[in-house]
Swiss-Prot record:
Belongs to the CFAP52 family. PANTHER family: CILIA- AND FLAGELLA-ASSOCIATED PROTEIN 52, WD-40 REPEAT PROTEIN. One of its GO terms (cellular component) is axonemal microtubule. This is Cilia- and flagella-associated protein 52.
Length: 620
């Protein structure tokens, strides 16, 4: 009997064209490759290799969970990356071949999390530190891709080791440091052992955040949470000096880099980038950047270097004039919505906590940023004429901005009691329909200078998650997390039809012929409904695991796209109800997905701040 079951047809893969995103929270996650042409950085469970000049991107897929550390060998031949996993499970280290852009080996020994990685100067060994639940340090042979030896990383009476650096000249020495522990290790290869020596810092108790070795191994420098720098001698294991005595770096020294000339580049948790020298450590040059600095990576000898911050900014800094240029930026919080202007795929807007951003589609460049401090924007929509961008905020206000300049045009205060959760506009640009956290749907008349409430439609019992308007502006449908979808008559301003289901509806779409709607939500089902009488037509299993949060349909109504908590973008055939293509690449829950006008791209956004652009799989 079992032999007769036909295997399912192979589902095609969506082609990933570009990623806008950078996880700035990974310590020393941003790396400049020794070929000086590429930046390497993590985003969720993928690693991006981006050409500095052409912005061309390659992706390394292989981790099953978020990447927690990245390192590159001195020769540039290998990349190693570690990941986080669940408590008690093995966390993988992956060794990549840089030239071929492919996985070479999976090194699995640590549990829970890989804290830090470092290559030896001649590419012989890789050293790895396990996370707080693991607490061990392991040396791996790169030639044999197997572990040589391991040991507990820190003593019994001190905290965890969190950073590691290899000697610049010898393959047999490395340093680990962390909470109250600084150790110099010697590798004894014939006996397959590593011998630690605890470094003496006297009365000073420090938690080390960052570490860097001088190019001749004469000293290594440690940045601490206290905001000062320790200079240690690896031969004598003694403290050489510390500083600055006054004006310590605010929020700790989160990144540190030795230069060949003998100076230090120091990045603080408050976003201050400083060039200083031992023993005074007084700033010689300094600039203020946005977000705490987590990575400093030199291009070549350090005539130019790249800086990564927690707010997902990547800066390029020339050493001589010490001026910063923003290279890449993206959202560092969950992206709530994405929308294209009517009739053009050249640009699109996204919104998240604190800001709305407008992006140029082909170059991935940020064209405009509109910031409203300490507020979250839940939804956006362009007016059909392109003169205003309407946004829904959690402080209960609807704000309209000019899309070219970001100028605030008007605010509708107290639009909803518990924040505005969804917003839509009519094609004649005279009305805005908004939904709130308390479940009200409100219709606003927008004049030249006035914004007037036409009607408050009170039916939903919980927050409104999605609003779609019919082409003739006489009807709209609202989806709510109370398990109802309501079709409203926008002429009589009354309810036409109500759809009930045992789910929290997250998204709804009109079929272009507007006699059917499709809905989806937390029950993972995609349901088709008749608009006329609200009866169910069919139901599909949209996902095997997790809610479906975003949905969009093509203007022809032949295909539609969904995305949700299974991190997959799926393209469906509307009539057949079959998945035709699947896009793998997100590492956070997908919150919204859109098909661009003209069916060129699919843009999906996720809870980890990433924006992914996919090639639309069918000829438009």
């Amino acid at each position: 009997m079992e032999n007769q079951i036909q295997p399912k047809a192979e589902v095609a893969k969506l082609e990933l064209e570009a990623v806008i995103g950078f996880n700035g929270h990974v310590p020393t996650g941003l790396k400049c490759h020794p070929d000086q042409e590429h930046l390497i950085y993590p985003l969720g469970c993928t690693i991006l290799i981006q050409a500095i000049k052409t912005q061309e991107q390659n992706f390394l897929h292989g981790h099953s969970n978020n990447v927690s550390c990245v390192t590159i060998s001195k020769s540039g031949v290998y990349i190693a990356s570690g990941q986080v996993t669940f408590m008690g499970f093995k966390a993988d280290i992956i060794l990549w071949d840089y030239k071929k852009r492919e996985l070479m080996a999976r090194l699995s020994l640590h549990k829970g999390k890989i804290e830090a990685l470092a290559f030896s100067p001649n590419d012989l060994y890789l050293v790895s530190l396990g996370g707080p639940d693991d607490g061990s340090v392991v040396v791996w042979s790169i030639a044999k891709t197997e572990a040589i030896c391991g040991s507990p990383a820190a003593g019994l009476n001190v905290g965890n080791a969190t950073s590691v650096v290899f000697s610049q000249c010898h393959d047999e020495m490395f340093v680990t440091a962390g909470n109250g522990t600084i150790r110099v290790w010697e590798l004894d290869l014939p006996n397959r052992k590593i011998w630690p020596t605890e470094c003496q810092t006297g009365q000073m108790k420090r938690i080390v955040m960052s570490i860097s070795m001088a190019s001749d191994d004469s000293f290594f420098y440690l940045g601490t949470t206290t905001g000062d720098i320790l200079k240690m001698n690896p031969r004598t294991k003694l403290l050489a000096d510390t500083g600055p005595a006054k004006d310590k770096f605010s929020l700790g020294v989160s990144a540190i880099k030795c230069l060949k000339t003998g100076g230090l580049l120091v990045g603080s948790g408050a976003g201050l980038l400083v060039f200083c020298r031992s023993p005074s450590y007084k700033p010689i040059k300094k600039i203020q950047l946005q977000g705490g600095i987590t990575s400093i990576s030199l291009r070549g000898e350090g005539h130019q270097f790249f800086v990564g911050t927690e707010e997902s900014h990547i800066y390029r800094v020339n050493f001589t004039d010490f001026k910063e240029t923003l290279v890449t930026t993206c959202h560092f919080e969950a992206v709530e919505d994405v929308v294209f202007p009517f009739g053009t795929a050249e640009l699109f807007a996204t919104c998240a906590k604190k800001d709305i951003r407008v992006w140029h589609t082909l170059s991935n460049r940020e064209l405009l940023r509109i910031t409203v401090p300490n507020m979250t924007c839940h939804g956006i929509d362009f007016m059909r004429d392109g003169k205003s961008l309407i946004s829904a905020w959690d402080d209960g206000k609807i704000r309209a901005f000019a899309p070219e300049t970001g100028r605030l045009m008007y605010v509708i205060s107290n639009a909803h009691r518990i924040g505005v959760t969804a917003v839509a506009t009519t094609s004649d640009c005279t009305r805005v329909i908004s939904g709130g956290g308390e479940g009200e749907v409100r219709v606003w008349q927008i004049g030249h200078q006035t914004q007037k409430l036409e009607e408050a439609l009170k039916e939903h019992k919980s927050s409104v998650s999605c609003i779609r308007v019919k082409k003739n502006n006489e009807e709209c449908v609202t989806a709510s997390t109370d398990g109802t979808c309501i079709i409203w008559d926008l002429v009589r301003l009354r309810r036409n039809q109500m759809i009930l289901a045992n789910t929290l509806f997250q998204c709804v779409c009109y079929h272009p012929e507007e006699f059917q709607i499709i809905t989806s939500g937390t029950d993972r089902k995609i349901a088709y409904w008749e608009v006329f009488d609200g009866s169910g037509i069919r139901e599909l299993d949209g996902s095997l695991s997790g809610s479906i949060n975003g949905m969009d349909i093509t203007p022809e109504g032949v295909h539609f796209v969904t995305g949700g908590n299974d991190h997959l973008v799926k393209v469906w055939d509307y009539n057949e109800g079959e998945v035709t293509h699947v896009g793998v690449g997100h590492s956070g829950n997908i919150t919204r997905v859109r098909i661009s006008p003209g069916n060129e791209y699919i843009v999906s956004v996720s809870a980890d701040g990433a924006i992914l652009r996919w090639k639309y799989p069918f000829p438009s």
